[in-house]
């Protein structure tokens, strides 16, 4: 399985045999992409049974696991792995200064996620990572997800009412430093965010220009996550301009099925659901949203509020107004805790529409 790149099967096989060197080797190769599809409890069980000296032989896997723990909102476990990593580096007098810098720099990169959606705060750690590292990050790959499953960049990074222009400027300034240490992971995010902001302000020509720039920047670079964020903006723009996106949902779905990545299909389904809810075609909404089965899908924690917002829009389109009103208090509390100002505004508008 490992040699064929079938990393989920390899992880289960090595874990079942308690070959934790094998588990950690595959974790490093996968860089957390398919690992995210496993239940966090399973991964934590492996770590509990793995001897410390085995774990310390795999510092790159420890970095991947730190990021995975953030994705799963297992912050104490993330911090514990950080301490183990730094101790493992200090315990290796034979390690070159260059490799120490690479590992410590990549640790700073991963720790930046604890400042998630504080653009300037994250960038301070990205710059620290860049100053220490002589190679791109190993624990973050260009082909991996960037938005934690969210179809929107702006919903992730609009943190405070009245600061949108500052946030856009910060993205323009800060993203190049992140690209430098990740080999261009998430490329185009600042253009997508600017396009989304222009769309919400009714500046449709500016939105179209930013969208075209984002599509051009990510063309042929293998970052499907960012292309799907472009698609999300394109479908919303089509409601105002009448211009059809480059592919319809069925074409896009067939294309994604060939990649065997459930995360990409989940993002496409969310855009499909949101678009058809907005135009009132509830029978065309993907079943997982139409039948309200989101609990059956393993969404990463930072992307979950966007899925809840879209499910709210589906409830609204279905006339299930009591559901929208009843869910609002809990959703708004989550948005407040995560500093999701734009998601909160959408939920408030949906709740008002249901009253």
Where is each model-derived feature located?
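Alpha-solenoid helical repeat architecture
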Residues: 8, 19-21, 58, 95-105, ...
């Amino acid at each position: 399985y490992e040699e064929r790149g079938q990393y989920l099967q390899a992880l289960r096989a090595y874990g079942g045999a308690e070959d934790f060197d094998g588990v950690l080797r595959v974790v490093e190769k996968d860089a957390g992409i398919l690992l995210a599809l496993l239940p966090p409890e399973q991964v934590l069980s492996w770590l509990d049974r793995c001897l410390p000296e085995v774990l310390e032989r795999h510092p790159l896997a420890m970095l991947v696991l730190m990021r995975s723990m953030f994705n799963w909102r297992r912050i104490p476990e993330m911090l514990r792995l950080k301490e183990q990593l730094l101790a493992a580096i200090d315990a290796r007098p034979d390690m070159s200064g260059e490799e120490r810098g690479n590992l410590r720099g990549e640790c700073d990169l991963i720790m930046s996620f604890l400042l998630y959606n504080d653009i300037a705060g994250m960038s301070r750690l990205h710059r620290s990572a860049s100053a220490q590292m002589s190679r791109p990050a190993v624990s973050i790959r260009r082909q991996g997800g960037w938005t934690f499953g969210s179809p929107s960049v702006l919903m992730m990074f609009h943190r405070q009412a009245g600061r949108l222009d500052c946030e856009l400027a910060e993205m323009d300034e800060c993203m190049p430093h992140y690209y430098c240490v990740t080999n261009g992971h998430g490329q185009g995010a600042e253009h997508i965010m600017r396009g989304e902001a222009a769309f919400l302000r009714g500046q449709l020509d500016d939105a179209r220009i930013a969208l075209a720039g984002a599509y051009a920047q990510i063309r042929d670079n293998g970052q499907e996550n960012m292309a799907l964020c472009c698609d999300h903006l394109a479908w919303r723009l089509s409601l105002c301009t009448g211009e059809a996106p480059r592919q319809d949902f069925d074409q896009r779905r067939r294309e994604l099925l060939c990649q065997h990545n459930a995360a990409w299909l989940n993002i496409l389904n969310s855009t499909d659901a949101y678009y058809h809810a907005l135009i009132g075609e509830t029978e065309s909404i993907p079943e997982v949203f139409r039948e309200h089965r989101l609990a059956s899908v393993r969404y990463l924690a930072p992307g979950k509020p966007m899925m809840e917002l879209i499910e709210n829009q589906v409830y609204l389109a279905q006339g299930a107004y009591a559901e929208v009103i009843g869910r609002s208090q809990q959703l708004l509390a989550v948005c407040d805790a995560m500093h999701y100002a734009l998601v909160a505004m959408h939920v408030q508008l949906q709740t008002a529409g249901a009253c």
